[in-house]
Amino acid sequence: MLKNLKDLTLEDMKAKRLTLKKEYMDLRFKTVVGHVENPLKKRELRRDIARLNTIIHEYAIGIRKV
């Protein structure tokens, strides 16, 4: 799980979201092939991406200030 999201800058959050999306896609491909050590990791990644998307959107609409 992501810790201290409030400490990250907006650009760091966008970069972190991109790396999490890549990791999620890799995990999806491994699931299709059939070799996944921790199937719950997919759910955790999806939720972390959603958390980051929410915070980034809050910055975009002005709920959070930079």
From Swiss-Prot:
GO terms for molecular function: structural constituent of ribosome. GO terms for cellular component: ribonucleoprotein complex; ribosome. This is Large ribosomal subunit protein uL29. It comes from Borrelia duttonii (strain Ly). Gene3D superfamilies: 1.10.287.310. The keyword Phosphoprotein does not apply. InterPro entries: Ribosomal_uL29 (IPR001854), Ribosomal_uL29_sf (IPR036049). Pfam families: Ribosomal_L29 (PF00831). The gene is rpmC. Belongs to the universal ribosomal protein uL29 family. One of its GO terms (biological process) is translation. Keywords: Ribonucleoprotein, Ribosomal protein.
